[in-house]
């Protein structure tokens, strides 16, 4: 595996948060906004959930998965989604600094270090594949549910969803 770096110069919602969470290093500008917005659509962030939970911890994830609230870059840094939050004028310099340090490491050592950290996180490749399969089933089931259909229709119609209690 190669090192990955997220350079966040804007907002990230839904799967965009997942992409940030997947990266080894994440740097964002102070004005960036984030939201795990799937619940507003009657869905869940199933596909990205393993990566988001690994980045921000389960308790933060429970809150943000359910509320779908918008949070800003300083909060993203505080909870671990971003490693650094910088003024927009300093983003390129901050990214260059990280790339400088990455460029000093041996590629094999970096790949093994990344693999080691992933293993220490407790998830094997088989675990990840099983979770991906379970999450794919979950999101497929929710997308065709009445709630998922209403959420997506409301999003496309640019209106508030009309939720019905189960």
Predicted features along the sequence, with ranges:
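Crotonase-fold acyl-CoA enzyme core
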Residues: 1-110, 145, 159
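Helix-loop "lid/cap" segments that line or gate small-molecule binding pockets
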Residues: 64-65, 116-122, 137-143
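Short C-terminal tail/terminal secondary-structure segment
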Residues: 160-166
